[in-house]
Curated annotation (Swiss-Prot):
Annotated SMART domains: NAC (SM01407)
Region (Disordered): 120-148
Family: Belongs to the NAC-alpha family.
InterPro entries: EGD2/NACA0like, NAC-like_UBA, NAC_A/B_dom_sf, Nas_poly-pep-assoc_cplx_dom
Function noted in UniProt: Component of the nascent polypeptide-associated complex (NAC), a dynamic component of the ribosomal exit tunnel, protecting the emerging polypeptides from interaction with other cytoplasmic proteins to ensure appropriate nascent protein targeting. The NAC complex also promotes mitochondrial protein import by enhancing productive ribosome interactions with the outer mitochondrial membrane and blocks the inappropriate interaction of ribosomes translating non-secretory nascent polypeptides with translocation sites in the membrane of the endoplasmic reticulum.
Location relative to the cell: Cytoplasm; Nucleus
Protein name: Nascent polypeptide-associated complex subunit alpha
Subunit structure: Part of the nascent polypeptide-associated complex (NAC), consisting of EGD2 and EGD1. NAC associates with ribosomes via EGD1.
């Protein structure tokens, strides 16, 4: 029987393996009582590291201690927070792009898209002409680390003069210079 053939909400029992059977028999001998209705158990460790067990089997002893069975998965809260922030930023960017597209009222017919691409390629050709002019003129590199210039030239494949201008424009900030040139 495949997964597609099992109706949703059907009562499906999983056959436990030999070790699980032995552990459950020992639990019954110890007098532990099963607690129903628990959907998730988490154990927190230093550094926002969390071990999570989804759909656990939880037993309670007379002394008040708990025994938990299930598959533990490491759940890093810092990673979850970073993912949530990235997802939120992506949603905001999509909303902003949708608002910009709606406000501009641009026609997205094939002819309009072709015209936009041609316009962009013409503008790109003009910037290439500017880059050719940058190659011919000397640029003052004082106050800028030559290794930074070399790295930007290597990463963006622009002229050395363009890299120096971008670094000076952003006060030596390599990240912003790279973003501008790429």
């Amino acid at each position: 029987m495949s997964i597609e053939e099992i109706p949703q909400g059907a009562d499906v029992s999983i056959v436990p393996n030999k070790n699980e059977k032995k552990a459950k028999e020992l639990i019954k001998k110890l007098g532990l009582k099963q607690i129903k209705g628990i959907s998730r158990v988490t154990f927190k460790q230093r550094g926002n590291l969390i071990y999570a067990i989804d759909a656990p089997e939880v037993y309670r002893s007379q002394a008040g201690t708990y025994v938990v069975f299930g598959e533990a998965k490491v759940d890093d809260m810092n990673q979850r927070i970073a993912e949530a922030q990235a997802q939120q930023a992506q949603q905001e960017a999509l909303q902003k792009a949708a608002a910009d597209a709606g406000a501009a009222g641009d026609d997205k017919s094939p002819e309009a898209i072709t015209a936009d691409l041609e316009k962009a390629s013409l503008q790109g050709g003009e910037s290439n002409a500017d880059a050719a002019e940058d190659d011919n003129e000397e640029v003052d590199e004082t106050g800028i680390n030559p290794k930074d210039i070399d790295l930007i030239v290597e990463q963006t494949r622009v002229s050395r003069g363009s890299a120096v201008k971008a670094l000076k424009k952003h006060d030596g900030d390599m990240v912003n210079a790279l973003m501008e040139l790429s």
